[in-house]
């Protein structure tokens, strides 16, 4: 027989295609679609047949089956869109992930349908019912693998009634237990609504070949019955073949490989046996006598056997040259595993594998000829090597086929092989040795069960290269047989013959190009192979004949629609059958708590009774139940299925499986205000989410008594001030209010901080009651209105310049309305001494003020823009030079100094500093303009022109006056304004601005300057008192019967934004631990059958921010939260008219804000904290959660655990803590058998210095879950859960009480370090507790031993205390510390103090701030923020090893470091450690930057960068002819920057550019100017008296430094924006960036 033999079926001549258009869908979307007009009339026939009924289309590959499916999908969608059919989806099933991707892309290209793709890679297995409903609701067609659909149907996430059309790609698989068959049998036939079915296949027979026509007919009938469809085959294929041309079948024969390598094989076998013995010998060490190491050994031995088998197969079938490539491939795959393995036992076994491979490679290379590679490059090299037996004839034949292709690069050839290793090795051989330089060669393998398989992404990438012609020769397994579209494939070679008819038909169909060839490589003289080929070809004829000519009812079979063993949930319709329950039980066990040393899994034990099988199922200890016995059954496999079915029923009844029969997981929190179309809103309790809330009114300040006509009795509270500097005196005041304050609100003390370095100690003490008559009340009311408006507001509104009528606020007939929510009086006291027994109100000062107002009332005349003339005194007579005539009186010049006066023309209150004896009103006004030309000739001229005032005594000396100023927030410690390194103040007291005014324009007020100075302190004092009253009000609402200090509650509701000397941060930290502790105890007692994982999930849900937010909102806590700094400019006393109103634009008429979607935002631009005049303010949602935690912490500090429980229950947190259940726990533990471990337990008790009353608790606490595999039904996991919260509370409580002056952020770091697994593990090793651990894991023992060794080496090295060592810390060591704590806690009846007595010595020495070591990556990030540099990090992987590369650009040096590890976190830590070491060499460390950080955080708290600059600074003018891009390797092209011109926009854009290019942050400096009058900017008069100019310096590494000065602005941030904008424009000129506004 000739080597080349033509195919049995010659290709018929092609026919022209008919033009029969398919009805199109109405356009719906904007996506263009490709033409779906049927290629041939035959396809139209198939389509119409499918419309008439369920159809199985049998068509060759490439003939258009998928197009028919797309046409059907479009038709079904058209009916739904037209309203002709109810809303249902089309489900397109494909058996592989690759086909799912391919069909998804086809549907997207050829339709405008809304299509979704589902595969295992898309994590569909994690979807719940709601997610499925959402996805199905918004898509018209879903492409998925059949197992996903089967699972969705079983769990009732999807029902058959929701599907209008089922499309089965490669439907010949619908047999046996394949998901295709399961879908039909379990759900299709039992559904009241049955969707249409369309199946596609190239061959309906999936076996090795039908021996008779009858057998073929049986296969077809069975497929039709399963899919409830009829086979449809096109009889006349001529027209189809014009689009899918037939392939020429060519047989290539090769000689059998007769070379004998018995000597080599025997040596390889000896080595294999030898290394197998060495593997067995690994078990002799003590750590390897456990089940897990047995499993590793068994797996390792099987792997070695498989590797050996592959080598022998390659030697027998391919020859020793390719076998050497096989061994090299094995070495390359195992070496990375060996290098990165951290388990000593596994590493040792892998090293033995490597040794075997090296020995095998050495043996093989010994028999290979020298220079065989060069020989292969010669023309006859392969023939020579074949003759000598170094490559098989089969491989040589393949080489000759490739040679026959010539040098054409248009060849696209698929070479099918059976084994992955064959594809890899032959591909390497061809590419590396054979000289086929004109061809690009690669391989493509699949199969998720094989370690050698390529990932789906790599498969798709390789296939795309092949389609594009960038790969010519592609070695592949059966992954490309089914349905993969490679239309330009010119040749298909079956290096290994197809095993089934389907494989034959489908691989032949891959050759789609005209004149393509399908080459079968057949061993010469092998009759078995020839018969196999003949049977497959014969079956093709049988299939065609059966489909065309058989009788419709020729054969009939019974179809088992659904197994009799099922379980259904009536509420959802979820249904499971016995055969799927085993996997469901395994899935349930996978959800149980596990670690590296213990994987919970079910155990089946089958016994035989009277010839029947009965199975006992045992579940892990932490499952809902431990064992169940199934019914008798006819087979062992069925008995496992039935007992699993019974177990699933019981798990569902116990609530472990939900109503969809899915293992129960914690449902996501129910979030308020969220709907399906509002996904942009972040969840409650998050920082990103902003909510609008109101402010709770202080009830103690509410009232209407100021308007009472009768005598009123008020409570009095004396306010005294004592300055820490001599000579600074402040008058005392009295606060009068109707209600009586709590005894810890008054008396109270507070410190007021003044600049520079001045402090005023303030006390508020109750002084009993006082009765005021109507007259006194009126005068006191007038005094308060006069002074607070005169100092902080205005007594006159309107001006001559503005054109508005000048209006006196005290004009007759007008009364200032007092806010009923703020009702109190502040009156001066006569004696300003610090301690005063009696209370003496300074009525003279009060009445003097009233007299001044009366005088203005009586003298006010018609023209309200002119000063009343009768207020001005007569001309001075002779001899009165020492008398100064004021507006209301005349005084001796010696009495005028330090008096308080009121300006008639401005209505402002001043303090007289001195007389300016050498200056009168007739003198030049130029001095007031600081040397500039003045438009006024004199003071007389100035007052006449500006105010219309005629000076009557121009000869009088002017008075030098100190202007009144705005109130300041004096509650914020100015110590934070000190330079951390020098101690010098960073902010200085502003230069005082003085006024020069003629005396006759001033009204003298009979009050002292001490009284006036005290007014500036009162806003801060009253604000603090209001806060204390608010906290006291909240305390009354909570209603605990014991006293909780009001200062604690105030601290708990005060956020950092308030800029106070205290905040909720510390209490929040403590409250978090208290919540975790209380909820943990309650859950532990309440749910004795819940495992640790479930308890942890329940606790997390109970104390998460979303839950706490809900509780806080329920109690209206948001109204009490103090979330903004005290703003004295907006503070008003009762009777004071606000100069800075903030009208409410929130759309709410009440102070309370309802819970509604429109009052929630996640836009970061929303300003948080600033309230409107109704008290509405935007607040971070997390702030409310933080306050709940802080209040719990406050009550715990003030009243212990009982008070904390009270406030938690007040919030609505469900806490029971039934202590009767504790005795049940102890009783159950007492039954644990501890006799065999009594010596071990007593020894451990001695180390703990505590004797357990219930020894079983300690035994349970030291028992690892891995012992469950040996029959132990208890472990430490639940005790670990309890002990975790106990130790967390104890350590947090210790830190809170001990480190009172530590920053809250550092306190959090300390707690994290103290409760870390590393710290607990070190304590366990230090006290030798680990030796008592009961476990059944050799890997665990090995890791503990290695860690103990590493720990002992580091002992005594103080600098390495709690450093992150290279040796991984076994989590188990930390777990047993927590579990023992839980055991002690239970044994002592929940006595936390006794637990602390026992564990404090064990954990000592406790970490202190000076010993705290941050994780390297965290430390590096903080250091980068301090030095103003950006850290760049890139992650790659090499095998199982993760590689982290970090780069940090300093001023003129780029630091680069790498970290390698199997764990990404550890690799990141290693890289960060190397960067830190480099920085330390340059004198940069986090400790050195801490003092500077304090300075920077205060001066420019919104900008985290270094304000100092160094080095030479070049002006931007020097850069005009310099192209910076030439000196910057990092800038490849211009960076496109979005630029917002609003405040902060230019700075953000510049910072983003620096981050992208890894430049250091820019540096800013300020110059401030102060003016006597409001400054004019851009032609408009502003309300500001200060201006700022910012200078920006940007250092570009390895290039230059650019400096710019911005324009003048009224605040620092705007000045920074101006400078940043100029810098951006220059960088754009230099072609570094493109700014887009």
UniProtKB/Swiss-Prot annotation:
Claim: Ubl conjugation is one of the keywords in the record: no
Skewed-composition ranges (Pro residues): 9-19
UniProt key word Acyltransferase: no
Pfam families in UniProt: DEAD, Dicer_dimer, dsrm, Helicase_C, PAZ, Ribonuclease_3
CDD domains, per the entry: DEXHc_dicer, RIBOc
Helicase ATP-binding domain boundaries: 46-222
Motif, DECH box: chain positions: 169-172
Positions of the RNase III domain: 1031-1200, 1241-1389
Domain Helicase C-terminal: 404-556
Dicer dsRNA-binding fold domain mapped to chain residues: 581-671
Region spans: Disordered: 1-40
Domain DRBM, residue spans: 1412-1481, 1545-1629
EC annotation from Swiss-Prot or TrEMBL: 3.1.26.-
GO cellular component, one term: cytoplasm
PANTHER family, A to Z: DICER-RELATED, ENDORIBONUCLEASE DICER HOMOLOG 3B
Family as reported in the entry's similarity comment: Belongs to the helicase family. Dicer subfamily.
Assembly with partners or alone: May interact with ARGONAUTE1 or PINHEAD through their common PAZ domains.
Protein name, UniProt field: Endoribonuclease Dicer homolog 3b
């Amino acid at each position: 027989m000739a080597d080349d033999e033509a195919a049995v079926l010659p290709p018929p001549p092609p026919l022209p295609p008919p033009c029969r258009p398919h009805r199109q869908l109405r356009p719906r979307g904007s996506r263009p679609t490709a033409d779906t007009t049927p290629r041939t009339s035959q396809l139209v026939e198939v389509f119409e047949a499918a419309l008439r009924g369920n159809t199985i289309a049998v068509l060759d590959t490439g003939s258009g089956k998928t197009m028919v499916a797309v046409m059907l999908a479009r038709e079904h969608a058209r009916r739904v869109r037209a309203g002709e059919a109810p809303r249902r989806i089309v489900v397109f099933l494909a058996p592989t992930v690759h086909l799912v991707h391919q069909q998804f892309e086809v549907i997207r290209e050829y339709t405008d349908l809304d299509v979704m793709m589902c595969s295992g890679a898309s994590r569909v297995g994690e979807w719940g019912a709601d997610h499925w409903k959402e996805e199905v609701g918004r898509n018209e067609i879903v492409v998925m693998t059949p197992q996903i659909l089967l699972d969705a149907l079983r769990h009732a996430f999807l029902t058959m009634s929701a599907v209008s059309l089922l499309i089965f790609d490669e439907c010949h698989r619908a047999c046996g237990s394949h998901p295709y068959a399961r879908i039909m049998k379990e759900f299709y036939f039992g559904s009241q609504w049955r969707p249409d079915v369309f199946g596609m296949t190239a061959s309906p027979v999936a076996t090795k070949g039908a021996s008779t026509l009858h057998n073929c007919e049986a296969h077809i009938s069975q497929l039709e019955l399963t899919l409830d469809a009829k086979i449809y085959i096109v009889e006349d294929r001529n027209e189809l073949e014009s689009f899918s041309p037939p392939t020429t079948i060519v047989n290539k024969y090769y000689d059998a490989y007769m070379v004998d390598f018995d000597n080599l094989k025997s040596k390889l076998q000896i080595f294999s046996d030898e290394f197998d013995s060495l593997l067995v010998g690994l078990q002799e060490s003590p750590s390897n006598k456990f089940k897990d190491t047995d499993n590793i050994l068994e797996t390792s031995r099987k792997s070695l056997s498989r590797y050996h088998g592959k080598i022998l197969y390659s030697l027998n079938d391919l020859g020793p040259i390719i076998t050497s490539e096989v061994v090299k491939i094995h070495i390359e795959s195992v070496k990375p595993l060996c290098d990165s393995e951290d388990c000593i036992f596994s590493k040792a076994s892998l090293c033995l594998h490597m040794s075997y491979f090296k020995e095998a490679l050495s043996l093989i290379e010994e028999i290979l000829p020298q220079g065989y590679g060069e020989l292969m490059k010669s023309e006859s090299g392969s023939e020579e090597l074949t003759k000598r037996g170094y490559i098989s004839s089969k491989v040589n034949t393949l080489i000759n086929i490739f040679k026959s292709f010539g040098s054409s690069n248009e060849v696209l050839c698929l070479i099918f092989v059976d084994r992955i290793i064959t594809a890899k090795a032959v591909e390497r051989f061809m590419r590396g040795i054979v000289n086929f330089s004109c061809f690009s060669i690669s391989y493509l393998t699949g199969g998720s069960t094989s370690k050698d398989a390529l990932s789906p992404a790599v498969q798709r990438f390789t296939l795309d290269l092949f389609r594009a012609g960038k790969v010519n020769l592609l070695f592949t397994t059966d992954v490309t047989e089914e349905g993969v579209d490679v239309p330009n494939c010119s040749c298909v070679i079956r290096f290994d013959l197809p095993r089934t008819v389907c494989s034959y038909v489908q691989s032949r169909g891959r050759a789609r190009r005209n004149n393509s060839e399908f080459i079968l490589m057949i061993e010469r003289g092998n009759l078995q192979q020839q018969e196999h080929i003949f049977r497959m070809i014969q079956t093709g004829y049988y299939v065609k004949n059966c489909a065309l000519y058989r009788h419709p009812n020729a054969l009939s079979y019974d179809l088992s629609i659904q197994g009799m063993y099922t379980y259904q949930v009536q509420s959802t319709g979820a249904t499971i059958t016995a055969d799927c329950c085993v996997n469901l039980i395994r899935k349930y066990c996978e959800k149980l708590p596990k670690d590296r040393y213990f994987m919970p899994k079910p155990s089946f034990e089958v016994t035989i009774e009277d010839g029947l099988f009965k199975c006992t199922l045992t579940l892990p200890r932490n499952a809902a139940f431990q064992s169940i016995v199934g019914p008798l059954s006819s087979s062992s496999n069925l008995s496992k299925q039935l007992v699993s079915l019974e177990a699933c029923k019981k798990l569902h009844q116990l609530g472990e499986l939900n109503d969809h029969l899915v293992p129960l997981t914690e449902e996501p929190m129910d979030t308020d205000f969220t709907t399906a179309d509002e996904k942009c809103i972040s969840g409650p309790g998050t920082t990103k989410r902003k909510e609008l809330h109101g402010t709770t009114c202080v009830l103690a300040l509410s009232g209407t008594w100021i308007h009472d006509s009768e005598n009123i009795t008020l409570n009095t509270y004396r306010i005294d001030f004592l300055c820490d500097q001599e000579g600074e005196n402040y008058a005392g005041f009295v606060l009068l209010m109707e209600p009586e304050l709590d005894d810890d609100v008054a008396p109270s003390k507070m410190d007021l901080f003044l600049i520079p370095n001045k402090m005023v100690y303030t006390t508020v003490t109750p002084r009993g009651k006082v009765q005021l008559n109507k007259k006194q009340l009126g005068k006191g009311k007038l005094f308060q209105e006069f002074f607070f408006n005169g100092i902080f507001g205005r007594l006159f509104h309107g001006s001559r310049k503005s054109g508005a009528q000048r209006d006196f606020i005290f004009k007759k007939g007008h009364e200032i309305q007092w806010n009923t929510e703020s009702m109190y009086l502040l009156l001066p006291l006569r004696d300003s001494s610090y301690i005063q027994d009696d209370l003496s109100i300074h009525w003279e000062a009060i009445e003097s003020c009233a007299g001044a107002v009366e005088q203005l009332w009586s003298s006010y005349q018609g023209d309200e823009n002119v000063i009343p003339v009768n207020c001005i005194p007569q001309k001075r007579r002779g001899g009165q030079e020492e008398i100064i005539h004021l507006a209301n009186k005349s005084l001796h010049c010696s009495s005028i100094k330090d008096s308080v006066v009121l300006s008639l023309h401005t209505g402002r209150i001043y303090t007289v500093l001195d007389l300016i004896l050498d200056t009168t009103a007739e003198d030049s006004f130029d001095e007031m303009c600081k040397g500039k030309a003045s438009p006024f000739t004199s003071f007389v001229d100035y007052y006449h022109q500006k105010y219309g005032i005629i000076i009557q005594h121009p000869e009088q000396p002017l008075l030098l006056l100190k202007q009144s100023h705005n109130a300041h927030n004096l509650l914020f410690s100015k110590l934070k304004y000190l330079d951390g390194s020098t101690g010098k103040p960073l902010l200085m007291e502003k230069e005082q601005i003085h006024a020069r005014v003629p005396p006759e324009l001033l009204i003298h007020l009979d009050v002292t300057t001490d009284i006036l100075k005290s007014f500036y302190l009162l806003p801060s004092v009253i604000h603090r008192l209001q806060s204390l009253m608010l906290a006291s009000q909240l305390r009354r609402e909570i209603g605990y019967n014991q006293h909780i200090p009001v200062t604690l509650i105030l601290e708990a509701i005060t956020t950092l934004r308030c800029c106070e000397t205290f905040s909720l941060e510390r209490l929040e930290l403590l409250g978090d631990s208290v919540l975790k502790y209380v909820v943990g105890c309650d859950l532990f007692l309440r749910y004795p059958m819940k495992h640790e994982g479930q308890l942890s999930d329940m606790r997390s849900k109970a104390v998460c921010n979303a839950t706490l937010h809900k509780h806080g909102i329920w109690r209206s806590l948001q109204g009490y939260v103090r979330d903004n700094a005290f703003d004295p400019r907006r503070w008003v006393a009762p009777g004071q008219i606000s100069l800075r109103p903030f009208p409410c634009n929130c759309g709410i008429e009440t102070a309370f804000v309802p819970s509604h979607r429109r009052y929630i935002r996640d836009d970061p631009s929303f300003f948080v904290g600033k309230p409107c005049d109704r008290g509405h303010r935007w607040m971070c949602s997390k702030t409310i959660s933080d306050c709940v935690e802080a209040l719990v912490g406050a009550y715990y500090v003030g009243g212990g655990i009982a008070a904390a429980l009270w406030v938690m229950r007040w919030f609505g947190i469900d806490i029971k803590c039934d202590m009767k259940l504790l005795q049940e726990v102890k009783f159950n533990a007492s039954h644990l058998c501890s006799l065999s471990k009594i010596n071990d337990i007593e020894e451990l008790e001695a180390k703990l210095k505590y004797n357990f009353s219930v020894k079983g608790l300690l035994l349970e606490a030291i028992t690892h879950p891995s012992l469950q595999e040996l029959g132990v039904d208890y472990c430490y996991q639940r005790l670990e859960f309890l002990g975790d919260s106990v130790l967390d509370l104890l350590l947090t409580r210790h830190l809170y009480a001990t480190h009172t002056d530590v920053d809250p952020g550092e306190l959090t770091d300390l707690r994290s370090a103290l409760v870390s697994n590393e710290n607990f593990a070190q304590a366990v090793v230090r006290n030798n507790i680990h030796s008592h651990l009961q476990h059944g894991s050799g890997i665990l023992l090995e890791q503990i031993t290695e860690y103990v060794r590493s720990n002992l080496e580091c002992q005594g090295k103080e600098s390495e205390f709690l450093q992150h060592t290279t040796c991984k810390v076994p989590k188990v060591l930390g777990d047993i510390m927590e579990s023992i704590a839980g055991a002690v806690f239970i044994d002592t009846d929940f006595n936390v103090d006794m637990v602390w007595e026992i564990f404090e010595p064990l954990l000592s020495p406790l970490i202190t701030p000076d010993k705290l070591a941050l994780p390297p990556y965290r430390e590096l990030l903080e250091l980068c923020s301090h030095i103003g540099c950006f850290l760049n990090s890139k992650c790659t992987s090499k095998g199982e090893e993760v590689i982290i590369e970090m780069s940090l650009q300093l001023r003129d040096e780029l630091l680069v470091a790498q970290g390698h590890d199997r764990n990404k976190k550890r690799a990141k830590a290693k890289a960060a450690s190397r960067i830190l070491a480099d920085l330390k060499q340059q004198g940069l460390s986090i400790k050195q930057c801490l003092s500077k950080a304090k300075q920077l955080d205060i001066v420019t708290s919104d900008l985290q960068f270094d304000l100092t600059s160094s080095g030479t600074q070049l002006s931007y003018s020097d850069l005009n002819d310099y192209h910076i891009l030439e000196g910057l390797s990092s800038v490849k092209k211009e960076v496109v920057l979005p630029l917002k011109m609003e405040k902060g926009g230019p700075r953000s854009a510049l910072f983003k550019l620096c981050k992208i290019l890894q430049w250091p942050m820019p540096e800013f400096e300020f110059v401030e100017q102060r003016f006597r009058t409001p400054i004019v900017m851009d032609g408009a008069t502003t309300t500001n008296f200060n201006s700022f100019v910012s200078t920006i310096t940007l250092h570009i590494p390895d290039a230059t430094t650019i400096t710019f000065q911005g324009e003048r602005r009224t605040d620092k941030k705007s000045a920074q924006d101006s400078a940043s904008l100029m810098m951006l424009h220059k960088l754009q000129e230099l072609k570094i960036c493109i700014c887009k506004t």
